[in-house]
A protein has these predicted regions:
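An N-terminal structural lobe/cap that precedes and organizes the functional/catalytic core
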Residues: 1-39
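Short, flexible loop segments at the rims of nucleotide/cofactor-binding pockets, characterized by
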Residues: 138-149, 262-269, 293-295
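Extended, H/D-rich, highly charged conserved domains that either
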Residues: 39-254
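Hydrophobic/aromatic-lined pockets within catalytic cores
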Residues: 15, 30-33, 176-183, 195, ...
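Short amphipathic alpha-helical segments and helix-helix/interface helices
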Residues: 26, 151-159, 176, 276-280, ...
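SIR2/sirtuin-family catalytic core signature
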Residues: 1-15, 263, 270-355
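Short, conserved aromatic-histidine micro-motifs
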Residues: 30-43, 315-324
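Glycine-rich, phosphate-binding/catalytic loops in enzymes
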Residues: 21-25, 183-186, 306-308
Length: 355
């Protein structure tokens, strides 16, 4: 009887490894580059997230660009500042508003803010976002693999057969390290491992294109004249008294939107359907066990394909606290009614009984 066992991050956490997004990855990212982390947090994550699936669901879906424009707005606010030019009472020019005005305009013109240059100065780090996350993941998984080498798992609680096949969504070597009877040829690391391949992560293209606030022209809610949360709204004196044209600000706003669209599109996860199909197509699977996986919508295409290949298989999934989130994620999927939800202890009992 063929068994397919699908492992998520909960499998590593079950074995006591430091692979939590909030508790383990976030501190590493902050240590790597705290400024970039805070910027990305403001761009994509309105509030703290706990799960890796939440991270993938949000990455590439811009919430606000205020944090990108604030350095430029600060410079503009101090660009044309008459108060800074005011003459002291002892000066013969004290109270000469028009002279102060002209001095302020001259000073502003001499120190004119070049919008694109300032944006590049403050935000060039965004060009390395994917590598930033990859490096954080590699460091976290390296720590987890080192922990694997040090731990003594005399009581593993899980029985795997030599004939079991595995799909691991993890980047660690936990499965083959702790369960040496599992052949590496029976494992598909669908998103890579830190030892062998580039780590794969990201969001679905339809999430990024269809729900990126009002920043994307392919979004039906996009309105070029009303790009919420990203325009620099300029006081009229910047245009009247310094040689700025409204078109310069309009062009800057459009360039920022285009840049962010490009950045967001780079966050699309390349779904490895062909790779998974090649791994599975010659197997005869009767039972499917899903352990430690929250069934994030980003990864549902894999499960739809698994259902197509093995429509008669029984499905079981482990539930840590509540099944509500999983049920919401797989709502209206092909396999929605196939899944049987079991608390972790009951799930492992069933898995071991069918060993």
């Amino acid at each position: 009887m063929g068994r397919l066992i699908i492992l998520g991050n909960g499998f590593d956490l079950y074995h006591g490894l430091p692979t939590s997004y909030k508790n383990d990855l976030v501190p590493i990212l902050k240590e790597l580059n705290s400024d970039l982390f805070e910027k990305l947090n403001k761009l994509y994550f309105e509030e703290n997230i706990d799960l890796w699936s939440d991270f993938e669901k949000q990455i590439g879906r811009t919430k606000s660009l205020d944090c990108l424009n604030s350095p430029i707005i600060d410079k503009l606010l101090y660009l044309f500042n008459i108060d800074a030019i005011s003459y002291p009472p002892e000066s013969e020019n004290y109270g000469n508003f028009w002279l102060e005005f002209e001095e302020a305009r001259h000073e502003a013109e001499s120190n004119r803010v070049h919008l694109e240059t300032v944006f590049s100065e403050y935000h060039s780090d965004l060009d390395d976002v994917k590598e930033f996350f990859r490096e954080g993941l590699k460091q976290m998984c390296k720590c987890a693999n080192e922990a694997n080498n040090k731990k003594n798992y005399l009581n593993k609680n899980i029985l795997f057969s030599d004939n079991d096949y595995f799909i691991s969504f993890n980047y660690t070597n936990t499965l083959e390290k702790i369960y040496p009877n599992v052949s590496k040829s029976n494992i598909c690391y669908i998103h890579g491992t830190i030892e062998e391949e580039e780590l794969i992560f990201g969001n679905l293209s339809e999430n990024i294109v269809d729900t990126t606030s009002d920043l994307n022209e392919e979004n039906e809610k996009y309105c070029k004249s009303d790009i919420k949360g990203c325009e620099i709204h300029v006081k009229q004196e910047f245009i009247d008294n310094v040689t700025y044209e409204q078109e310069e600000f309009d062009q800057y706003n459009e360039n920022v939107v285009a840049y962010m669209n490009q950045l967001n599109m780079s966050m699309i996860k390349p779904i490895q359907i062909k790779r998974l199909k090649k791994f599975l197509e010659k197997l005869d699977i009767k039972k499917i066990y899903i352990f430690g996986f929250s069934m994030g919508k980003v990864d549902l295409p894999y499960f739809e394909m698994i259902y197509d290949l093995f429509p008669k298989a029984e499905w079981f999934i482990s539930v840590y606290n509540s099944s509500t989130m999983i049920k919401e994620n797989i709502e209206e999927s092909k396999f929605e009614k196939k899944i049987k939800y079991l608390k972790t202890e009951k799930f492992l009992e069933k898995l071991n009984r069918n060993f």
